[in-house]
Structures are given as structure tokens and as C-alpha cells.
Amino acid sequence: MSVISIVPLASKSCLYKSLMSSTHELKALCRPIVTLGMCRRGKSVMASMSTGLTTAVSDDGVQRRIGDHHSNLWDDNFIQSLSSPYRASSYGETTNKLIGEVKEIFNSLSMADGGLMSPVDDLLQHLSMVDNVERLGIDRHFQTEIKVSLDYVYSYWSEKGIGSGRDIVCTDLNTTALGFRILRLHGYTVFPDVFEHLKDQMGRIACSANHTERQISSILNLFRASLIAFPGEKVMEEAEIFSATYLKEALQTIPVSSLSQEIQYVLQYRWHSNLPRLEARTYIDILQENTKNQMLDVNTEKVLELAKLEFNIFHSLQQNELKSVSRWWKDSGFPDLNFIRHRHVEFYTLVSGIDMEPKHSTFRLSFVKMCHLITVLDDMYDTFGTIDELRLFTAAVKRWDPSTTQCLPEYMKGVYIVLYETVNEMAKEAQKSQGRDTLNYVRQALEAYIGAYHKEAEWISTGYLPTFDEYFENGKASSGHRIATLQPTFMLDIPFPHHILQEIDFPSKFNDFACSILRLRGDTRCYQADMARGEEASCISCYMKDNPGSTQEDALNHINNMIEETIKKLNRELLKPDNNVPISSKKHAFDISRGLHHFYNYRDGYTVASNETKNLVIKTVLEPVPM
């Protein structure tokens, strides 16, 4: 089963259709197909919070399983009516002016004769400036300035860390933690041993028991740094445990404030499930609150002004792209299939949450289309299709020839044609940016994905429960991460020659770790709902089979430990020094992993997650930020 299948949202009538609307009758994608409106409903299997399993006998006499998924919740008329004043050219002119002013701020920090620099806090100023533009999602405008600042900071870096300024001899926890995180993320060689030098005689991070704002900020940056850990870095594990405990205790003692908001956000989303656009939106609110309290300096106010304007200009582009996505979804004929989930708006929210570069529209649109196709295939293989039908479809995908649809049942013909045409169209578009035909790469990934799906369908059909290792290896392919990443990545304006592709696609460690995280995390959040739909095999059930006497809690603990270790491995694959494969070539695939992980963050029930996802769509796509 694919884990790239966003969960349902709670209803909100002013924005999208009511859950109580009547079930759509299946219509033809090519010709009339089996309709569930005439099916005889069977006895429901145990319900799973917001979706259960219903058996239905179609009018051709075939008994089918359907997931009782609700229809699309985001009304197409509402989406097509979206508008924004920030499309006007005057806003672009203002943006360019502000970009120039922020560059001047960066340059003043680097002035040899001092400028705004103070020898007691210049290193912290450089790092704070870089941190601000990155968290606000505007760093793409300042790559040259960021490198100058980080080169300057790194020139003072030592095995004991750094002080807040070039003339400060004593190591400063806040500056060292912030510096370690940013430098490591930008590919500089830094070692976690710097934190050993910040311990007291008892082997603990030295800090007072008082929760002062300055100390809390230092521990917050220590926590953020600890999340960029590599395997085997024990001091980073210690720092994470210590800082997380400290911050949770601090939340109990400090008043509700911008600082408490920042702590709550970082604790909730950490690094591996953080969406950059959601972080930008949240950090804008935090800095805005500081502005009201007159806690911001003039430079940060200028950066904030640019961030708000950039957010809203991209918001206007989001509206256009979302309209395009909605038209594609509608024209595909998928709205008439009532056995599939319709999550194109949620998928768009995810991808626009990880890539806010205006020129990457084709990447975002390709990602949404591919993820929606994955969801259609997931629902077809996991529930609706019979095993004989799925064997025919699997063979047709391998042949990659529309003439093979003659042997498919009617509902599969339409699915196949949309899949075939969409993938071919995207491959043709990708050839413009890659300078070569990439279709074979994508076909190989698609065949592996469909093959893994088919194996799981055979397991469901026969009632077979595999071993953990057998399930996990197959599950990495069926997670959908590889196929969801590969085709959209080719649409970027970044060349991906074969030697780079080998480092991010199958069978690279990078691809293996990303697929592993999605499969493991998806199973911990969805295994109960999957079992309710008749899908017994999961990481949890297979672990319990391999370890008689173990409980679900034992299985979850084991899998959560696997996830934590695999995240560290993926961090290392992203950030390891490699002159042949720059970080920028791996960043989109890594961010897709983070984005997909976000949708399974702390998810133990669809009701809570529904509200969270709904709010995410509204906050990052539908609503502009107040100016």
C-alpha cells in the first residue's frame, strides 16, 4: 500500500463540499463502467476512525472492496474564484527594492572598517541574519551574501566552538549551537565534539536552573542543532534529550509569548518533518509579535517586511497553480470515480510548502499529478480491483502501450490512459531541462512501484503475512517515494546527469533511507486503518509475527527507533562532502521526504490530523499574510 495518500479533512462548508453530499455515480473515463450506485452493500468491516471498508457487488456481479472515502472537499468553483492583488507589477518593484536594502544590511556586516559589526557579537550577528532569511523563506535572494557571512564565521570556528564575537575568547553556547547547525547544513565540516566542551564536571550541558529568555534561546538553538545529527554522534543524542526536556519544562513556567510559540513549533515539527513555508508563516507571526512589543531592531524589521511581501506574491502564484491542478483533476475524469481519494489540494499544499521558488511551477504541478496518480493506483490495488484485473493492469504497465487497454476492464482503461498520457507528457517536458530522454528512468521506477503494489495485492488475496524483512523491502518500493520524487525532479532547472542520479535514485543509500522513513512512519500511523480495510501486512504485524509474544507497543518502539536512526543516516547522505554531487542536487528529494513525513507527524487518528491538515491548507495556500 502506498503511504503517499493524504488523509481526509474536516468539512468547512464555505470552502468545500459537505461530507454529507451524495456519492458520485461512476461515469466513464472512456466508456460506461461499473457503477457503485447499483451495488449491493455488504457488511462493513470494523470502522477506522474516519474511513472503514465496505464490500459491494457491482452490476457485473463482481464483489469489490471499497474504502468508503469521502469526496473531494475543496470545491472547484471556490478554487477557480480565488484572486489576489499581489499579482500587480508594483509589488514586484517593491520587492526588488527591499532585496537591495537587505543585501546592504548583509554587506554592512562584512565591512572591513567595522560598519554595524561589533567585535563582541559580530559572529552572532552574521549567524542571526542568515538564520532569519532562511526561516522566513527568502534566502534564495541572498546566496552570495550568506556564503560570505558563513565563510567569515567559519574562519573563527575552533574545536571548542566560537564566542559571540571575534574578540570573545570564551565559547558561547547560543552562538556555537546556531553556528554548528547552519554551518553543517551548508556543507562546512564541523564536529559535534564542540558540545563536549560545554559540559560541566558532571558531564551535563552547563546552564543555570533559571529560565531566562537568553538561556532559553540558547537551549532552543542547541535543540535545533541536535536534530542535524549523524549516526554514532552520542553527544548529539544527549543534547537532544537534555534540550527537549529543558524546553518542555520552560513552557510550563514562561508566559505565552513569541518565544513560547517558537519553542512549541520547533518541538512539534523538529527538522525532519518541517515544511519551510509553514515555518516561514509561523516565524512571520513570531517576528510580527516582537514588532508590536518593540523588540525588533530596524534591520530585522526590514527583513520581515520583505518576507511578508514575498509570502503574498508567491501566494498569488499558488492560486494560479492550484487552479491549474484543479482543472487537470477535473478533466482527467477522476472526480467521477467514487472508490478513490481526491487529495490534489493537499498534495499541492505539501509541494508548495517545500519549494517556494516561483520558476519551479512545473516541478510543483508534476509532483501533484504524480501523487494523485499514486493515490488512484493505491486505492485500485489495495481495495477496488480484483486480483485478476490487477494482474492485467500490471502487465499493461510493463508493456507501456495504450493498445493493451483492450484487455482491461472499463474503469481501468481510463486510469491507464491518464497515467500513460500524463507520464509521457511530463517526460517530454523534462527533456527540455535535462537535454535527454528521461522516460526510461521513470518507466523503470513505475514498474518497480506497480510490481510492489501487485505483490501486496497477492498477499491480500491469499491472506499471506510475510516476514518483517520481506515486507519492509517490498514496502520501500510501494511507499511511492521514489516515483513521486523522480519525475518531478527532472522538471527542475537543475541538470541531473547519470552520476548525480545514481546518488539520489534507486539503488542509492539516499533513496533507500528516504523510502524507509516513509514506509516506517506511514505504517505506524496507518496500520489500524489499513487492517480495517483488509490489509493485514504492515511493519507492526510482521514484526509481531517474527517476534512471538511481542506487543503492538513493542513493535512501535522498535520501528520508531529504526526511524530515528534512518533519519540520521539520511542527514549524512544529504550533507556529506561530495564534490561530484552538491547538496543542492539532493535538496529537493530530501525536502520531499520531509514534506511527506510532515503529513504523518504525530498522527494517531484522522480526526485530529484532519483539522491540522485543513489549517495547513488555509494558512499556507488560501490566506495571505496580513501586511
From Swiss-Prot:
Necessary cofactors: Mg(2+); Mn(2+)
The EC number(s) this enzyme carries: 4.2.3.107
Highest taxon listed in the record's lineage: Eukaryota
Residues at which Mg(2+) 2 binds: D378, D382
Transit peptide: 1-36
Pathway: Terpene metabolism; oleoresin biosynthesis
TM stretches of this protein: none
GO molecular function: lyase activity; magnesium ion binding; terpene synthase activity
Record-linked Gene3D superfamilies: Farnesyl Diphosphate Synthase (1.10.600.10), Terpene synthase, N-terminal domain (1.50.10.130)
Keywords: Chloroplast, Lyase, Magnesium, Manganese, Metal-binding, Plastid, Transit peptide
Enzyme kind, highest EC tier: lyase
Induction / repression: By jasmonic acid (MeJA).
Xref: SUPFAM superfamilies: Terpenoid cyclases/Protein prenyltransferases, Terpenoid synthases
Annotated compartments: Plastid, Chloroplast
Additional notes on this entry: Expressed only in resistant trees, not detected in genomic DNA of susceptible trees.
Purpose: Terpene synthase (TPS) involved in defensive oleoresin formation in conifers in response to insect attack (e.g. white pine weevil P.strobi) or other injury.
Protein name: Carene synthase 2, chloroplastic
Organism, scientific name: Picea sitchensis
Gene symbol of the encoding locus: TPS-3car2
